[in-house]
């Protein structure tokens, strides 16, 4: 039995889950998310919990079991609390600012880089070297944060670039002169 898949998903009172032809729709205070789950996965709702079950113990069903449970649990978490990723900008003259809903990054290129967030994702810039990406869908929040980081990845010598707040940059020693 999948250790992740066999855990029941706790459904808070503020969240409403509807299952229609293997499409799971989760509505909560922060919004609504829907996800299509594989046809072989069995979903049962009982006493404020959602149980995810699989028909057989084949490797294919085992992998889908844990995946489906995690996706639905992330949807429930997203519509109740939401997700956020924090990024930091390191480097002299590197900064971020908002122009309307768009994020404008000045990170050492000859031109500013503009990033337009997709629907359902909010970007905040509390300081000009900090970025916060917020949203209900964990996957989309992670993708937007990765796209921002990819504009100028941190380099290993001075650590300049855009990094996740919790990320540790492994530093290299520069070349030594004779």
Swiss-Prot record:
One CC-aspect GO term: cytosolic large ribosomal subunit
InterPro entries noted in UniProt: Ribosomal_uL6-like, Ribosomal_uL6-like_a/b-dom_sf, Ribosomal_uL6_a/b-dom, Ribosomal_uL6_bac-type, Ribosomal_uL6_CS
Pfam families associated with the record: Ribosomal_L6
GO biological process: cytoplasmic translation
Protein's UniProt keywords contain Amino-acid biosynthesis: no
Keywords recorded for this protein, A-Z: Ribonucleoprotein, Ribosomal protein, RNA-binding, rRNA-binding
GO molecular function terms noted in the UniProt entry: rRNA binding; structural constituent of ribosome
RNA-binding among keywords: yes
Assigned protein family: Belongs to the universal ribosomal protein uL6 family.
PANTHER family assigned: 60S/50S RIBOSOMAL PROTEIN L6/L9, LARGE RIBOSOMAL SUBUNIT PROTEIN UL6M
Assembly notes: Part of the 50S ribosomal subunit.
HAMAP family for the chain: Ribosomal_uL6_B (MF_01365_B)
Job of this protein: This protein binds to the 23S rRNA, and is important in its secondary structure. It is located near the subunit interface in the base of the L7/L12 stalk, and near the tRNA binding site of the peptidyltransferase center.
NCBIfam families, per the entry: L6_bact
Descriptive protein name: Large ribosomal subunit protein uL6
Biological source species: Natranaerobius thermophilus (strain ATCC BAA-1301 / DSM 18059 / JW/NM-WN-LF)
Protein's gene: rplF
């Amino acid at each position: 039995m999948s250790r992740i898949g066999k855990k029941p998903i706790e459904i808070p009172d503020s969240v409403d889950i509807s299952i229609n032809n293997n499409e799971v729709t989760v509505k909560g205070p922060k919004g609504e998310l829907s996800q299509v789950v594989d046809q072989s996965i069995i979903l049962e709702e009982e006493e404020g919990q959602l149980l995810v079950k699989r028909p057989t113990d084949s490797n294919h069903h085992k992998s889908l079991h844990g995946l489906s449970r995690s996706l639905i649990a992330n949807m429930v978490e997203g519509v109740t609390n939401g997700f956020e990723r924090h990024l930091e900008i390191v480097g002299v003259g590197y900064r971020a600012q908002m122009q309307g809903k768009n994020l404008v990054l000045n990170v050492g290129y000859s031109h500013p880089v503009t990033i337009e967030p997709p629907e359902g994702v909010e970007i905040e810039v509390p300081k000009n070297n900090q970025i916060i990406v917020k949203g209900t869908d964990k996957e989309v929040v992670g993708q937007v944060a990765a796209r921002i980081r990819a504009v100028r990845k941190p380099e290993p010598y001075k650590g300049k670039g855009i990094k996740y707040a919790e990320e540790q940059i492994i530093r290299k020693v520069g070349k030594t002169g004779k």
